[in-house]
A protein has these predicted regions:
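Short conserved segment of the HATPase_c
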Residues: 152-164
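Conserved micro-motifs of the catalytic ATP-binding
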Residues: 60-65, 103-106
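Short alpha-helical segment of the dimerization/phosphotransfer core of two-component systems
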Residues: 40-48
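Short alpha-helical Gxxx[C/S/T] motif in the catalytic ATP-binding
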Residues: 175, 179
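Short beta-strand/loop element within the Bergerat-fold HATPase_c
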Residues: 129-139
Length: 209
């Protein structure tokens, strides 16, 4: 059930926090290093709780979008800035956007969150480069995020947006599921596939009329 899966997800960072705290208490762990892990896992748990709350709001029909006219390029640049600390280890993020503003009616906070989630995944799995492109036609803007990693296991592709799905990597979660729900709230679509190198995520949402 949802609650069983949620409690399992929360248990993982809690166990790490408890383990490192006990290590400090027993004097068998470096205090600074253990404190860093505790802080990281606390942040991870906070993010997970927020995702669980948001997905439950969507399920109950209580997630309301606060729409405004937004230049999607600025939102994408915000996403790049958000993941730059993760990419600092040698991953180049290469943007390719139109020169003119690309206006969409969106909930700036929620859509930025969805894009940043895909970007952060891409940075983690990229070897050296993450390409972020934006294209627009009369009806839609298409955002494409492609890494140069190993791609997504073929057996995982049909389930990549499923809640709590544990794929070949052994990791599970609801980040991608929440991303899909946010895109759907914007009357858009999102899909994942493998390219010649790495994974490709494509988001399509309506442009402003």
């Amino acid at each position: 059930t949802f609650f069983q899966n949620a409690s399992h997800e929360l248990k993982t960072p809690l166990m790490a926090i408890q383990g490192y705290a006990e290590g400090i208490q027993a004097g068998v762990m470096d205090t600074g290093g253990a404190a860093d892990v505790i802080l990281e896992e606390s942040d991870r748990m906070t993010e997970l709780v927020e995702e669980l709350l948001d997905i439950s709001k969507i399920d109950m029909g209580r997630q309301r979008l606060t729409l405004s006219e937004t230049d999607i390029r600025e939102l994408l640049y915000d996403g790049i800035r958000a993941v730059e600390p993760i990419a600092a280890g040698g991953i180049a993020i290469v943007p390719d956007f139109p020169e003119e503003p690309v206006m969409v009616s969106c909930d700036d906070t929620q859509l930025r969150r969805a894009v940043t989630n895909i970007l952060s995944n891409g940075v983690r799995y990229a070897r050296s480069e993450l390409r972020l492109t934006c294209r627009v036609d009369k009806r839609h803007v298409t955002i494409r995020i492609q890494d140069d990693g190993d791609g997504i296991a073929e057996e995982d592709l049909p389930h990549i947006f499923d809640r709590f799905y544990m794929g070949k990597s052994g990791k599970s979660g609801i980040g991608l599921a929440l991303t899909r729900e946010i895109i759907h709230l914007h009357k858009g679509t999102i899909r994942a596939r493998n390219g010649d190198t790495g994974a490709i995520f494509e988001i399509s949402i309506p442009v402003s009329r």
